[in-house]
């Protein structure tokens, strides 16, 4: 039995090493051949083995009796401690907000506000429609719910005489809400019997520069991540206490509401809720399985039927383009055509270039190995669904024939979510919009902004510590360790807790760009996963 378990463990390590080595080689753009890739696989096998061993020992060392230190009482689960830690975190976030006043935002956010505010919206993507305007309330290129929220605060700023005030108020409110949420998570660990050092580590983590930077940044991914954490906590409650009477009522209602909210904040939220809630069928008993199905399908009904079929036509909202869904497929086909044009018939080439506003001669110049946007933004909006279906059949045929090329196209973009190559990206500035006559940051704090940015860059380059400043640690390495630990400790029911995280990793893998904000929901939930794995070690010791 032990030999079988060891064999499975080694196969698992090899599997992780192969994925990570591919992510490493292709994300770097290495072309050193099979031998170099094999060497990386062996190195990553050793690194994963060492990481699993060290992580388990580190968690075991934290199993310390609470009475040894009086300061452990700070993390006991009561409203006073939640308030204290909330104020501490808010003080950190508020300091960041003052330095980066009125806070940071993204180019996408500015476009969203321009979209709704002007009423005559430019079609930002694809490129060949860059000068086309449509008479619409807004475009669903970005989630309309977040567009409404961001524009609401922009208008508040205008009413108060300065658009910067609206951005500041939004980031102030977001910082306060995140402070309360994160403090509640830290103190909630006490009710789970988690070792108190985990609560301390989590508090320091939530006060870290990367979390503070995103707490004062207006953007759809930040807003989605906030609601995702709440969703994950309720998902955690139901998955770990499937027979609890409370979960049969209040928890299921909360899960349904939060499933809809994460879908409204980010389109991938609909698919995450669908897949994750259906996974609850594996752990919940009897009639509760109906609840799991309902909560899974509700976001699909709201977004695909109520919004797309009823509200959008009624309110004159233009649906988003299909290129967002097809971007990864376009990227794979583009790379395959560039490297192996002889494998495509003239009819297949004509089909692909009918969908994209791009000639075969231009493709190599348009293609970017690290981002899908340049290729997908050439999509012709008027393309018929039957043409897209024909293309997908062609894509599937070539995927089977050229899996290596297609996989390389994916990892060239998003290998940084698997291999420890990419540090955190944060937003510390605001893009100015001539259309909105906003936003801007004062010159008097420029030196402080530069100093904090340099400090974060310095942290990311400290040996050993830099491991915790990598996207891949939160998106792949620690979840992979968690799966290993749950299986080793025979706590397989906890594997279900990885479903939302695995779903998000899937979307990261086929995403348009390797950027921290897309992985933010997994970074925010890391302390929860840390607590669960610490609890797994503790429960085993008590058996």
Across the structure, where does each feature detected by a protein language model lie?
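Membrane-proximal stem/loop segments at transmembrane-domain junctions that anchor or position
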Residues: 316-445
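Transmembrane signal-anchor helices characteristic of membrane glycosylation enzymes that use polyprenol
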Residues: 12-25, 44-49, 78-106, 300-312
């Amino acid at each position: 039995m032990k030999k079988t378990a060891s064999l499975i463990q080694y196969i698992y390590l090899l599997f992780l090493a192969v994925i990570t080595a591919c992510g490493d080689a292709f994300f770097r753009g290495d072309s050193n051949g099979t031998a170099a890739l094999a060497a990386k696989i062996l190195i990553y096998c050793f690194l994963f083995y060492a990481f699993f061993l060290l992580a388990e020992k580190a968690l075991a060392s934290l199993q310390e009796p609470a009475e040894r230190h009086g300061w452990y009482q700070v993390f006991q689960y009561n409203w006073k401690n939640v308030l204290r830690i909330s104020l501490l975190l808010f003080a950190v976030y508020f300091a960041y907000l003052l330095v980066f006043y009125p806070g940071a935002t993204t180019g996408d956010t500015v476009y969203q506000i321009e979209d709704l505010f002007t009423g005559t919206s430019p079609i930002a993507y694809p490129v060949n429609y860059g000068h086309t305007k449509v008479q619409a309330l807004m475009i669903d290129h970005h989630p309309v719910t977040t567009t409404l929220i961001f524009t609401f605060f922009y208008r508040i700023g205008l009413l108060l005489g300065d658009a910067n005030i609206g951005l500041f108020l939004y980031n102030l409110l977001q910082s306060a809400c995140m402070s309360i949420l994160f403090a509640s998570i830290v103190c909630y660990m006490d009710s789970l019997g988690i070792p108190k050092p985990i609560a301390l580590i989590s508090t320091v983590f939530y006060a870290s520069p990367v979390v503070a930077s995103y707490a004062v940044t207006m953007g759809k991914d930040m807003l989605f991540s906030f609601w995702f954490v709440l969703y994950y906590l309720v998902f955690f409650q139901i998955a770990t206490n499937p027979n609890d009477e409370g979960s049969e009522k209040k928890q299921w209602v909360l899960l349904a509401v939060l499933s809809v909210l994460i879908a409204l904040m980010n389109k991938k939220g609909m698919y995450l809720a669908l897949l994750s809630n259906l996974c609850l069928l594996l752990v919940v008993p009897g009639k509760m399985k109906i609840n799991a199905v309902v909560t899974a399908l509700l976001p699909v009904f709201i977004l695909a039927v109520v919004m797309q079929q009823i509200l959008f036509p009624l309110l004159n909202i233009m649906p988003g383009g299909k290129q967002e869904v097809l971007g990864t497929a376009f990227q794979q086909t583009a790379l395959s055509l560039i490297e192996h044009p002889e494998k495509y018939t003239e009819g297949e080439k004509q089909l692909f270039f009918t969908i994209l506003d791009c000639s075969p001669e231009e493709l190599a110049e348009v293609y970017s190995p690290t981002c899908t946007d340049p290729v997908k933004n050439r999509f012709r909006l008027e393309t018929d669904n039957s043409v897209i279906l024909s293309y997908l059949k062609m894509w599937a045929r070539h995927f089977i024939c050229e899996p290596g090329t297609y996989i390389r196209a994916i990892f060239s973009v998003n290998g940084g979510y698997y291999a420890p190559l990419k540090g955190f990206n944060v937003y510390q500035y605001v893009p100015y919009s001539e259309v909105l006559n906003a936003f801007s940051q004062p010159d008097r704090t420029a030196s402080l902004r530069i100093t904090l940015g340099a400090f974060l860059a310095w942290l990311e380059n400290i040996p050993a510590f830099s491991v915790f400043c990598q996207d891949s640690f939160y998106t792949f390495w620690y979840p992979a360790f968690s799966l290993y630990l749950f299986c080793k400790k025979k706590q397989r029911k906890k594997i279900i807790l990885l479903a939302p995280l695995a779903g998000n990793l899937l979307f990261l893998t086929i995403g348009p760009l390797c950027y921290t904000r897309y992985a933010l929901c997994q970074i925010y939930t890391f302390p929860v996963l840390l607590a669960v794995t610490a609890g797994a070690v503790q429960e085993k010791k008590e058996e």
